[in-house]
């Protein structure tokens, strides 16, 4: 009998909640001491409840809470992704700094060097570091 009443009253809660789930939610509200009102929710058609002076639809509230939880999980995933990207950027910046320090060191050595073979070695090392720097930027 109550299932038929619920089927007739709750017409629009969609795929997010089955009739059996709606019955559980509504009966739990009654067990918690809420009073079922004769007015119905404009969104889902289920009866509104009143408890402690607050009038609410337990079906829409349950769906809203589920959406809030999912939204919170998505926000956590986004925050984690941002933190990971920041970490990667910091690593790249650290690597960039190390490469620049090595280039500067080799330039100073190059200024002091007189031997041709050694100048060539240092110049090749600087060239490789510059190519690496361009790749990481």
Swiss-Prot record:
NCBIfam families, per database record: PRK00420.1-3
Superkingdom of source: Archaea
Annotated source species: Methanocaldococcus jannaschii (strain ATCC 43067 / DSM 2661 / JAL-1 / JCM 10045 / NBRC 100440)
InterPro entries in the record: SSSCA1 (IPR009563), UPF0148 (IPR022954), UPF0148_domain (IPR051888)
Phylogenetic lineage: Archaea, Methanobacteriati, Methanobacteriota, Methanomada group, Methanococci
Protein family: Belongs to the UPF0148 family.
Protein name: UPF0148 protein MJ0890
A Pfam family matched in the record: Auto_anti-p27
Record-annotated membrane-spanning stretches: none
């Amino acid at each position: 009998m109550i299932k038929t009443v619920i089927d007739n009253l709750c017409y629009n809660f969609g795929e997010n909640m089955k009739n059996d789930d709606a019955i559980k939610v509504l009966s739990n509200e009654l067990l918690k001491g809420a009073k079922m009102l004769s007015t119905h929710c404009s969104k889902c058609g289920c009866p509104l409840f009143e408890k402690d002076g607050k009038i609410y639809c337990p079906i829409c509230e349950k769906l809203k809470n589920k959406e809030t939880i999912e939204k919170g999980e998505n926000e956590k995933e986004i925050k984690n992704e941002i933190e990971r990207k920041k970490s990667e950027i910091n690593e790249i910046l650290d690597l960039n700094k190390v490469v620049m320090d090595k280039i500067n060191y080799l330039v100073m050595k190059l200024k002091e060097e007189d031997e041709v073979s050694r100048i060539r070695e240092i110049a090749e090392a600087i060239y490789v570091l510059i190519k690496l720097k361009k790749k990481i930027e």
